[in-house]
């Protein structure tokens, strides 16, 4: 008896193409500059982690995108985070919110402090002196906490766009699989 991998050859190819389209479009959208950004995103650990996985089991085919679980902040970049006082318009529908009491205290401040020190830049005060890293961390953290993080929807939009065509493609591929299998049975 043929395995699912042999029997569903065309269907697996369609699902693999679907996953590849989502992966490629997610990478393109991630680097795109949005109106709320001063400049486009850079290729960092999240960009490099964007991947797909298509697995064939005994009676099913699984398409997954493990980077959404592997990179702990991927969902926040994709869906955004609502701020405590106001939010960016793309983040209004986000399930995540600063000040909800679910995150660890001081996590944002520590991360911003490390980021500011690694980038090695400093703001200037009104009289021209450089601000301390601690003051910059406070200002940036307060802004993010109050305004939130805008949603990029780099994965969500890519998935939804590719998913629109998927049902028709799967029907055609499944029909080809059945047709091929039927030919094998009738020619024996």
Which residues make up each language-model segment?
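Charged low-complexity regulatory regions
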Residues: 76-84, 107
